[in-house]
Structure formats: C-alpha cells, structure tokens
Amino acid sequence: MNLTNFPWLTAIILFPIVAALLVPIIPDKDGKTVRWFALTVGLIDFALIIYAFYSSYDFANPNLQLVESYQWLPEIDLRWSLGADGLSMPLIILTGFITTLAILAAWPVTFKPKLFYFLMLLMYGGQIAVFAVQDLLLFFLVWELELVPVYLILSIWGGKRRLYAATKFILYTAGGSLFILVAALTMAFYGDTVSFDMVTIAGKDFPLKLQLFLYAGFLIAYGVKLPIFPLHTWLPDAHGEATAPAHMLLAGILLKMGGYALLRMNMGMLPDAHAVFAPVLVILGVVNIIYAALTSFAQRNLKRKIAYSSISHMGFVLIGMASFTDIGTSGAMLQMISHGLIGASLFFMVGCTYDRTHTLMLDEMGGVGKKMKKVFAMWTTCSLASLALPGMSGFVAELMVFIGFATSDAYSPTFRVIIVFLAAIGVILTPIYLLSMLREILYGPENKELEEHHALVDAEPREVFIIASLLVPIIGIGLYPKVATTIYDATTNKLTALVRNSVPSLVQQAKAKTPSFSLYSLKAPEI
C-alpha cells in the first residue's frame, strides 16, 4: 500500500481534535474510561507521527516535506497549507511524546475529568498545528486558538491564585498576538502579490526599514512565549498555579513555540533584520541566563524556582540563533528539544512531591529523600540533567551554543569574550541553586509535622515510567547527539547560510553612507 501522498500532517492534527469532540458522549462515571480513551488517542497519534517521520521524512532535505495545500479563500490566497522541515519535525515529535506522557501524568485528576481530557486533546492537535502550518494567517489562528485550552486548564484546575495567573497569561499572550496579526497582514499585502503563504512571503524583497519594523513586532510577540526578559513575568505565575500535566506542556511545548517562531519567521523570513538585531538577541540571552538564575536563588516556592530556571535556560536559544554559525544555530535547536524534555521531567517531579507533601515551600520540606528512595533518585537525576551534567542533553546543547558563538566571525573578539564570560557565570550559578534545592527537599532534618499529616509514599510504577521515558532521550541525546541533530541540521545550516549572507551586504550598505560605520561590531564573515 503506497502512502507517499497520504495527508499525514492533516491526520495527525485532526485525529486528537476529532477524538476530543467524542469525549463528552463517552459513558463514564468515575473518569477511568475517559482517561484510558485519551491515553489511547495520544499513543495512536504519536505512533502516526513516528510512522510518518520514518516513512516520508528525508534527513538530507532542508526544505519542506510532507507538504499539503488546499484552497480555502482564493481571494487572498488563504490555504490549508502544511509542511514539515528540520525546524518543525523534531518539535512535532516532541509534542506527541510529551503530551502523551502528560495525559498519563494526569491520572490523579478527578475533578471534571471529561472536560480536562477534552482540553488536553484539543491542545495536542493545536500545538502540532502551530509547528506544521505554512500559511501565516492560519498560523495566527492556531496560535490564538491553542491558548484557549491552556487558559481553561489554568483557571479551572490551578491553585488558589489560578484566575490571576490564567488572566495574566492570556493578557500577555493575546497582547503579543496583536503584533503577529499586524506583521502578518503587512507582509501578506506588501508588493504586487497578496498571499499569506510563508514561502511566497519569504521570497518578497522587503526594504530593510520595513524588515526591522516587522522583526521588532515578531520579537515582542514570540518573546512573550519564549519568554524573554522583561516579557517573562507571566511564566512564574502560570507555573506557580498549574497542575503537573499543565506544567509539562507549558515547559515542554509552549515555550518552544516562541523559539520555533523566531527561527521560522525572524531568521527565515527577515534575514537582513535578523543580522541587525542579532547583537540585541545575544544581550537579551545573557540577561535571561543571569537574571533568571539569580532570581531563582531567591525563590522559596518550588514551582517558581524551576520556572525561573526555565527562563534562564532559554537564554541559550537566543545566543545560539544569533551566532551566525552552523553549530550555534544547531545548539539553539537542540537546547529547545533538551529543555522540553528536562523541563517536563522537573515539573512532573514537582507534582509528585506536592501530591505527597501538600506544600511547595522549601522551608516546609526536608528529609523527604530518606522516606522515598525512588523519588530521591528521580529528583537527583532530573536535576543533574538540568544543570547540564556531561552525558546528558543539556550539556551538549549548551556546549554547542558556546562553541558556536565563541568561534563566530560575525562579532569582534572582545564582544565574544565578554558574552561567553557572562554566559559562563549563568552556567556556574545553575548547579548552585539546583543542588541547594535538592538539599532542602531531600536531605537535612526531617519535618515531623509533614510526616505526621501526610503519607510519604514512594513513587508508584506510573510515575517511575514517566520519568524513565523522559530520561531515555535526555541521556541518549547526551551520549549520541546525532540522533537529534541529524533530523534538523540540513535545515538549520540552510538558515544560518541565509542570515550570514545578509551580513556583508548590510555592512556594505552602511559603509556607503557612513565610512566609519560598524554594525554592532559586526564584520563581514568569510563565506
């Protein structure tokens, strides 16, 4: 049976959405049937992703594959246009993997289980759509629609301040989305051809001033989701009130949507503006790394501490994508994949700990590891992964970003040394606050009140399975990075070449107007 032309991406997107529509009519009194139904849907959709990947995806092809395009509104060339390349495919696989585990992590949810799993399956399809659509207006629509289930999950199943956190989340993201809409309309209607097709838009010759305007708009919108300082304040509040499955999706998938969009649109569609903004991204990345690491020190709430750790790690994505080197861009992509796995594992462990201790305050914990040996081992391994221990994915990703930026010929040596030194400070701070966190949770004197009022039961097989499933790719990528980089290197190398080619032309244009001009200490690379 020849399935070469089968609409894989449409099937992968619509299957969980259609399944979600069936959830309300499933006869179920205690939530057991619907949870197994949701898990089955997640597993089947993930299997479809893996099959489509192995049967139809060519690692060496940097261009869009699995392409589908169906006419929707011909007047403005609006199409149901899908495709996957090296930027999309790894994140689609990551989405299927983490969302399926998040459904399994939601086993303890007993309040309105039908509504919960309905929203989880809607998120599943919506998140994959964000990474697959190749029409800019359609991208805006799925970007917005995907926010609705996140808002509802936060506001219904969150903590005491859930409405505040959910409202702040929707205001930040919806406010940023206005910039996406304005930029999308401007790009689509510019020139003689009206089209929202991303490939068509990428081929338009936008003047530099317009590119800078569009780039700034996209940077604000996607900087909210990544997040970038100072647009980050919604994230600690959202994580502070979310449940464990929502944590896994926030850290594992939603933040990656911002990084993906920056690579796809800011780098891929506005390369000249990216060459100008690159030093700004580098500085913002360093600020993310150091500011969030220092702020994490001061947090006594476990969720907020790890939330700031996530913000710090995403700073490496900004530095990597602004490095103008193949290895740096590849490192940025790997950091997104790595953090998706590590962030999901850490926040799942927060949920496991809270289910047993019913507290998130580090001051009220202590000696937990003495009673729960499996939880002790799981916490320790996940934390070592987060601090970029050699042999784990975070180490490889951060090392690639460091090497990529340090060897970049697009910046002056002085600027490179300063940035590498400052980023290294963040790397040193990470194990300090993570190991300190472990000490307060697992070691030290036992909290007798905690033991008297709550049963400190060790991890059950379901929880061990979830963490083990996340650690397999974390360690696998750490030991053999090519298992991940082979998927996307052809695309990221093409993207890097595109922005590198923009640097010499910009420098020449500027020097023609101002002989002493130096574009943020950029110099024309040898290409």
From Swiss-Prot:
The keyword Oxidoreductase does not apply. It catalyses: a plastoquinone + NADH + (n+1) H(+)(in) = a plastoquinol + NAD(+) + n H(+)(out); a plastoquinone + NADPH + (n+1) H(+)(in) = a plastoquinol + NADP(+) + n H(+)(out). Keywords: Membrane, NAD, NADP, Plastoquinone, Quinone, Thylakoid, Translocase, Transmembrane, Transmembrane helix. NDH-1 shuttles electrons from NAD(P)H, via FMN and iron-sulfur (Fe-S) centers, to quinones in the respiratory chain. The immediate electron acceptor for the enzyme in this species is believed to be plastoquinone. Couples the redox reaction to proton translocation (for every two electrons transferred, four hydrogen ions are translocated across the cytoplasmic membrane), and thus conserves the redox energy in a proton gradient. GO terms for molecular function: NADH dehydrogenase (ubiquinone) activity; ubiquinone binding. Pfam families: Proton_antipo_M. This is NAD(P)H-quinone oxidoreductase chain 4 1. GO terms for biological process: ATP synthesis coupled electron transport; electron transport coupled proton transport. It comes from Microcystis aeruginosa (strain NIES-843 / IAM M-2473). It is an enzyme of class 7 (translocase). It is a multi-pass membrane protein. PANTHER family: NAD(P)H-QUINONE OXIDOREDUCTASE CHAIN 4, CHLOROPLASTIC (PTHR43507:SF21), NADH-UBIQUINONE OXIDOREDUCTASE CHAIN 4 (PTHR43507). The keyword Secreted does not apply.
